Each structure stands twice: as C-alpha cells, then as structure tokens.
C-alpha cells in the first residue's frame, strides 16, 4: 500500500508541474479573493483536487471528499467550505472550462506564448500535438544488467508478468 501511495503522490506532483498554468487558471476562476501567503497549502490542495478531477480516473465524490477532509489534517477547518465550493464548481463547469481552455492554448498546454509562436511557425501542422506530447508522462525505461540477465530473457519475464516492453534503439542494455 505504501508503494501505491508513493506512486500516486509522484503522479500527482508531476501532473501538477506539467499542468500548473491550466490548474492555476481554473482554480482562480472560482476563488473570489486571493488566499493569504500563509494559506498556500490550501491553494495547493485545490490545485491537487482540480488536477485529479481533470486528469485522474478517480470518482469525483472521492476527490472532493478527500480534499475537504485534508483541510482538517492541515488544521484549517475554515477552508473546508472553500475547497468544497471550488471543487464542486469545477466539477459542474467541466465542459465549459474545457471549451474555454480550447481558446487559450498557452493555458491549455501550460506553454508560454513565445514558445507556442515558435512551434506554430516551425511546425504549423504539428504544434498542438507537440505541446500535447510535452505534457505526457514520460515512458519508463529499464536498463538490463547484462552481467546478470540476457535482454531477451528479461523481456520474456516482463511479458509473463503482462508488462509490455520493447528494446531500445540507442543502446544494447
């Protein structure tokens, strides 16, 4: 269970970094006044909730419930209503938010406008797919210690564990 929690935490952290501009834009639409500096943890909690609502395959009610419960753990009970209201609003407005993001590529793809301009100029047909791919989780890479294993045998053991693999093309390890 610890390794599952660690993997989930890692996925959330990387996802927040990848999609920060988008998540921040969405969260600020539903927060009427800026949070105090000492309440950055609540802002982060909201960002995590928004990320999970948009990008993770978890039930919405569980995301919202856990986010609200975390306010108590942070000893900020006052924030429960805020976190609940923001995340429920995001949940309700998901379709309109997605449509709005489609008109704001620098926010949708979390890329600066200058980079989008360069990509658009150099790859007019492919710039959107390039930005989408920039935001994808990187593939896992394994290096086989050839002193202990043969590459083909290791791939075979991965396949037996129902893990798809392919040999790299840059090195033979």
Annotate each PLM feature.
Residues 1-173:
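Class I Rossmann-like S-adenosyl-L-methionine
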